[in-house]
């Protein structure tokens, strides 16, 4: 799951997307600025006739706060289910259960139901891998993957890469399975582990450290043509100033200057008012009509705070993502890659998983929906019938049918659109399947034989002189060879991974620049640019036994991602390296091993997109129908929660669906 949207928290915290803007800007800006000369929005009024009816808005608020219909928190109960299993007393006999999809939601639901004594079969379209959008490029694993990088010890994330400490259900699974976690540095740190904010902002031909921009933003801001009132205010502070009045509906600023949630009843009502007021607004409309920001200032915020690609999409979607995680929340990564979590889940249900079984048809029994197209199910059972087909990659194409009493459908709605279901689902569900908006996200990862982002200038001198005694000065003066001969030239780069064709393509795409910026000298964190790469991230930790590392050279969403999706995989790597060089300088080329990996979630035949990223109005128009069972069909997956793209949303939905089946 691609972590995941779009805005830096108004109080300096991080949404799923704001790590892409890298909180260094917001964090430093918060300490250095106290306000902004901007048109501040009015409080989110509850009686706006343009909004959705208040009951629907309350339903959305309950979903995002994870409350039941009596406004009681559900998370403690869900945690107890993960710890102790489903309730011991069942109302009916054990059921035959089909789980469609072996992502986190499907695996958790299958594990819980199996522990409770139900007979479970999991159907997964992928021929060899479970985990859905939790995917690690690695050697081996349960999928027995081939070595992805020149160094067999290296691995990198194609999807989910960090886990908030405030996601209790995922943290419960990590602790229960005894997986090793460590801090994920979304803000770069120095060698002592202190926030450094030394990574780069590279926009409009200007390159500046994040900390320097937070202290003196005028040069960058003026390059966007923003009004004089915004010359000396960092982008994060401008954004914070227009979002804070909305957050006042459900939280307040404490004496220590930090946001504190209001009591639950007030919080619920406040969120409902926000949904009613802005539920059918896009982020662009909010920033222009409500916040009164001009186009140039929105360009500044969009570029530095990763809002550009999300401006046409739902304000509520972005605002929820920015508000459910405290600014003090630590983030973690899993040693060995995030895929160790689905590894652990798969171990518990492996014998029940059928890989290479793509579901093409579903029939289900519903007494109120008679249909002449339903031939395989009946009132006395089976209640669910599923037709599948294999992809035939390792043998002949085969069809296989499965029956059950109930099913858990975790397929993304973008993929469920291609599954024939009889009788037809309810109108609300069919509308959600047809209309729920999924976005694109693409990563391009490049392997280097040395962790050059951790170098100081003395390190650069030493390493470049190992290639040629005069090479350090040649790069500094723009005299280094530009014909591709220096690609992977360092002695640490394994031979045999860079072809003559790669050198030619690289030389044709090589960044043309004579200046060489100073060493980054950081651990973790990342940089932002207005070039095609947009956001770049360094590993937070070295891989034991390896002197190199894999850089997330480009992480992009929406239209930015589509620019990469048009390129073949191999064609992306020289472009991504060029974008890195525009930010970090040409000399990084000597450590490039020639190995890269890329993931387009929109082009993925199992994911059908990054995640559900809702359009204006879809929270109130579609959300209520998405998680509701249709007879014996139950629905789970992060798209059925108000935490799309987060593993927490998938686990939350899995526990809900398992309880529905077990207690029916």
Swiss-Prot record:
Temperature section of the record: Optimum temperature is 30 degrees Celsius for recombinant LGOX expressed in E.coli. Optimum temperature is 40 degrees Celsius for recombinant LGOX expressed in P.pastoris.
Top-rank lineage group of the source organism: Bacteria
Signal peptide: 1-44
Regulation of protein activity: Activity is stimulated in the presence of Mn(2+), Ca(2+) or Mg(2+).
Catalytic function, reaction form: L-glutamate + O2 + H2O = H2O2 + 2-oxoglutarate + NH4(+)
PTM text: Predicted to be exported by the Tat system. The position of the signal peptide cleavage has not been experimentally proven.
GO biological process: amino acid catabolic process
Record carries keyword Nucleotide-binding: yes
Binding positions (FAD): 105, 124-125, 133, 161-162, 638, 646-647
Localisation per UniProt entry: Secreted
Primary role: Catalyzes the oxidative deamination of L-glutamate to 2-ketoglutarate along with the production of ammonia and hydrogen peroxide.
Protein name: L-glutamate oxidase precursor
Organism: Streptomyces viridosporus (strain ATCC 14672 / DSM 40746 / JCM 4963 / KCTC 9882 / NRRL B-12104 / FH 1290)
Gene that specifies this protein: lgoX
């Amino acid at each position: 799951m691609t972590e995941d949207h779009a805005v830096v928290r108004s109080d300096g915290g991080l949404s799923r997307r704001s790590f892409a803007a890298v909180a260094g800007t917001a964090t430093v800006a918060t300490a250095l600025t106290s306000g902004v000369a901007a048109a501040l929005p009015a409080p989110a009024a509850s009686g706006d006739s343009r909004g959705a009816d208040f009951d629907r808005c309350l339903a959305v608020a309950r979903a995002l706060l994870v409350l039941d219909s009596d406004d009681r928190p559900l998370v403690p109960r869900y945690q107890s289910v993960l710890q102790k299993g489903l309730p011991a007393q069942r109302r009916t006999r054990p059921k035959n259960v089909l789980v469609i999809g072996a992502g986190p939601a499907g695996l958790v639901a299958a594990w819980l139901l199996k522990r409770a004594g139900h007979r479970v079969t999991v159907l997964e379209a992928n021929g060899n891998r479970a985990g859905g959008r939790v995917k690690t490029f690695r050697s081996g694993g349960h999928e027995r993957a081939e070595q992805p990088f020149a160094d067999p010890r290296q691995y990198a994330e194609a999807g989910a890469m960090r886990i908030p400490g405030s996601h209790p259900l995922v943290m419960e699974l990590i602790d229960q399975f005894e997986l090793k976690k460590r801090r994920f540095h979304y803000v770069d740190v120095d060698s002592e582990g202190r926030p450094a904010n030394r990574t780069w902002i590279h926009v409009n031909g200007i390159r500046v450290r994040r900390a320097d921009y937070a202290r003196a933003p005028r040069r960058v801001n003026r390059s966007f043509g923003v009004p004089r009132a915004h010359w000396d205010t960092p982008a994060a502070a401008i954004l914070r100033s227009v979002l804070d009045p909305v957050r006042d509906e459900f939280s307040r600023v404490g004496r220590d200057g930090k946001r504190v949630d209001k009591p639950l009843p007030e919080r619920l009502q406040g969120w409902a008012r926000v949904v009613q007021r802005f539920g059918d607004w896009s982020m662009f409309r909010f920033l222009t009509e409500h916040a009164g920001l001009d186009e140039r200032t929105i360009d500044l915020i969009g570029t530095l705070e990763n809002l550009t690609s999300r401006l046409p999409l739902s304000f509520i979607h972005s605002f929820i993502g920015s508000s459910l995680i405290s600014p003090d929340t630590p983030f973690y990564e899993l040693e060995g890659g995030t895929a160790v979590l689905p590894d652990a889940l798969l171990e518990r249900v492996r014998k029940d998983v059928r890989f290479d079984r793509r579901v093409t048809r579903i029939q289900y029994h519903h007494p109120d929906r008679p249909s002449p197209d339903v031939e395989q199910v009946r009132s006395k059972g089976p209640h669910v019938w599923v037709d599948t087909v294999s992809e035939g990659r390792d043998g002949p194409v085969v069809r296989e049918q499965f029956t059950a009493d109930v099913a858990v459908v975790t397929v993304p709605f973008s993929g469920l659109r291609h599954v024939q279901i009889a009788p037809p689902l309810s109108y609300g569900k069919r509308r959600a399947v047809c209309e729920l908006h999924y976005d694109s996200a693409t990563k391009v990862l490049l392997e280097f034989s040395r962790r050059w982002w951790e170098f100081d200038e003395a390190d650069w001198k030493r390493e470049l002189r190992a290639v040629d005694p005069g090479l350090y000065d040649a790069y500094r003066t723009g005299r280094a060879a530009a014909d591709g001969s220096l690609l992977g030239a360092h002695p640490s780069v394994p031979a045999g991974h860079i072809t003559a064709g790669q050198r030619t393509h690289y030389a044709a795409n090589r960044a043309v620049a004579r200046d060489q910026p100073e060493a980054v000298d950081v651990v973790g964190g990342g940089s932002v640019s207005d070039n095609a790469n947009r956001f770049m991230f360094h590993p937070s930790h070295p891989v034991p036994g390896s002197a190199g590392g894999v850089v997330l050279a480009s992480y992009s969403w929406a239209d930015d991602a589509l620019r990469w999706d048009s390129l073949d995989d191999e064609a992306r790597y020289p472009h991504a390296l060029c974008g890195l060089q525009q930010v970090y300088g040409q000399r990084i080329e000597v450590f490039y091993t020639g190995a890269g990996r890329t993931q387009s979630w929109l082009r993925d035949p199992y994911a059908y997109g990054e995640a559900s990223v809702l359009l204006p109005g879809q929270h109130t128009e579609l959300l209520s129908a998405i998680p509701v069972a249709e007879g014996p069909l139950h629905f789970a997956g992060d798209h059925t929660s108000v935490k799309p793209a987060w593993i927490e949303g998938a686990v939350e939905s899995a526990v809900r669906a398992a309880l529905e089946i077990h207690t029916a």
